[in-house]
Amino acid sequence: LRHHWQEEAQHAKLDTLVAAELASQSTPLQIEQAIDDFLKIGGILDGGLQQQVQFDIGTLERAIGRPLTTAQRQEVESAQLKSYRFTFLVSGLEQPNFTRAIADLSPSGLTRIAQTARALS
């Protein structure tokens, strides 16, 4: 596990360097567009998480041998989606190294990312 963590940390550092190099060759407008595109990809991932929640509920209903009531379904759906969003989206959007890198590139981009993280929380 330790070696895996070290390898992942190296990837993150390399990714930051690559992003900085790309940004140095980009106009402010291109950087803003890249952040917009990044957020669109996040929206696509969120759609996948919403679909996964529906699959999870179907699996749960089959496992317990009965359908959930509307209230139960809404409660499970809300909790599961919040959990997935935090795990796969919000934790990354709020990661300190990521937010510092974005702040260096685009303060307005950081604001949009922070707003997105809050909306998903």
Segment roles from a protein language model:
Residues 1-121:
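Non-heme di-metal
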